[in-house]
């Protein structure tokens, strides 16, 4: 191994004195390598104009160019003279024309109530009854209301919605959920030959809705659009008798203290108190019959739980009934002589929720007195699972393509709610 010569050793030693570590490499400490090398430069100090009482600052506004020893002028905000939606600036909340001191708690399409049905019952002053009304169940059990070759036609609808309609291998929920409801409604409409009074109905989509009411010291509002609403020329007949309605006076609404009843509702100070049924005056089908609320979110975190979906169904059915009651009987809070009945069906394309609401009173401020009534039939499976591809094990088809564990009773209830009021 050759030894370094004298001049070479002196050069290496000289590099050490220069801070190169003795071998030509830069010498830095850990602090210099770690923090200082990644630290961003300090931001430029803000241009500040110091206002001294009695003295006017001398700026370079009249010079039309920057002068370093003169103060920076303060220019008024530039006005375009026209509204550009890309750069629109809303006025402060307290300066807007619809601003009000009293907050309004709003329920809309994407509100998910923490307490679910229990919270919705308190907000709407409603008594819950499990199961569908006897009048509706009698339509379910009556074989004369069944459709010819009913089960096979429902199976074809499921296969069409989940498999045949889409070009995807596995269609998403937002694709098959609305399709299966529309096809089931189309199948129900085939009964118009047997029951001509079904011709006095029509369906509408994306109907706007807004209604406001006071509950104790709270101002509540439901507003939004409904997926599909079936409306009719004639209202649904009352379900509960006058004696059953008067018996609700003794019912005590369940509370959920210490949780606030307005939790998960949107608190808003800019709002408009109005009643909107979604239909113009003179519309030939003014009475709401059935709301079809779809849960078609693909991502699981965005989906409603079954309890939250039933609460949403109750609030939107209640809002439609309340808006209709005020349209017919005025805004005076009182017990209705002719209760208003509105139905609702909620589904994710597989599990169905059925609900029937009877609005008995518009006096909702106090928890005493007559209560409204709601009947629910929860978590009714139309089918357990749908195989979009066959399951093959050892070259044997274990599970063929199609629905698994089909429940025909669920469609019978769906059909009974559709026929209610026409049979």
Curated annotation (Swiss-Prot):
UniProt-listed InterPro entries: mtLSU_mL37, Ribosomal_mL37/mL65
Keyword Mitochondrion: yes
Keywords: Mitochondrion, Ribonucleoprotein, Ribosomal protein, Transit peptide
Source organism, top-level taxon: Eukaryota
One BP term from GO: translation
GO molecular function, one term: structural constituent of ribosome
Subcellular location: Mitochondrion
Recorded family membership: Belongs to the mitochondrion-specific ribosomal protein mL37 family.
Organism encoding this protein: Rattus norvegicus (Rat)
Quaternary structure and partners: Component of the mitochondrial ribosome large subunit (39S) which comprises a 16S rRNA and about 50 distinct proteins.
First and last residues of the transit peptide: 1-29
GO annotations of cellular component type: mitochondrial large ribosomal subunit; mitochondrion
Protein name per its UniProtKB record: Large ribosomal subunit protein mL37
């Amino acid at each position: 191994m050759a030894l370094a010569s004298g001049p070479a050793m002196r050069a290496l030693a000289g590099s050490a004195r220069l801070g190169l570590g003795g071998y030509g490499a830069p010498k830095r400490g850990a602090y210099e390598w770690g923090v200082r090398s990644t630290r961003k430069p300090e931001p430029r100090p803000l241009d500040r104009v110091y206002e001294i009482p009695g003295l006017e600052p001398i700026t370079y506004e009249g010079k039309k160019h920057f002068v370093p020893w003169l103060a920076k002028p303060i220019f008024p905000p530039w006005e375009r003279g026209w509204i550009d939606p890309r750069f629109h600036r809303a006025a402060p909340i307290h300066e807007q024309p619809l601003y009000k001191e009293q907050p309004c708690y709003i329920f809309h399409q994407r509100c998910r109530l923490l307490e679910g049905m229990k919270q919705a019952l308190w907000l709407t002053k409603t008594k819950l009854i499990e199961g569908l009304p006897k009048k509706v169940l009698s339509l379910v059990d009556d074989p004369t209301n069944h459709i010819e070759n009913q089960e096979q036609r429902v199976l074809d609808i499921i296969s069409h919605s989940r498999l045949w309609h889409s070009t995807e291998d596995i269609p998403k929920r937002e694709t098959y959920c609305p399709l299966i409801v529309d096809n089931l409604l189309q199948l129900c409409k085939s009964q118009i030959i047997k029951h001509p009074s079904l011709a006095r109905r029509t369906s509408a989509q994306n109907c706007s809705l807004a209604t406001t009411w006071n509950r104790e010291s709270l101002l509540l509002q439901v507003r939004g659009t409904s997926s599909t609403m079936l409306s009719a020329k004639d209202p649904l007949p009352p379900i509960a008798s006058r004696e059953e309605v008067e018996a609700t006076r003794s019912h005590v609404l369940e509370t959920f203290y210490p949780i606030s009843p307005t939790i998960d509702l949107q608190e808003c100070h800019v709002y408009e108190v109005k009643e909107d049924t979604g239909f113009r005056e003179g519309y030939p089908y003014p009475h709401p019959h059935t709301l079809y609320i779809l849960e078609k979110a693909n991502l699981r975190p965005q989906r409603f739980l079954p309890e939250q979906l039933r609460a949403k169904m109750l609030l939107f059915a209640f809002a439609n009934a309340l808006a209709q009651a005020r349209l017919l009987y005025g805004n005076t809070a009182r017990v209705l002589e002719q209760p208003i009945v509105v139905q609702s069906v909620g589904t994710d394309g597989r599990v169905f929720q059925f609900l029937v609401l009877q609005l008995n009173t518009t006096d909702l401020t106090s928890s005493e007195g007559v209560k409204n009534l709601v009947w629910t039939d929860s978590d009714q499976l139309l089918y357990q699972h749908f195989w979009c591809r066959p399951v093959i094990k050892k070259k044997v088809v274990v599970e063929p393509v199609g629905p698994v564990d089909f429940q025909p009773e669920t469609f019978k209830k769906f059909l009974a709610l559709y026929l209610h009021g026409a049979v």
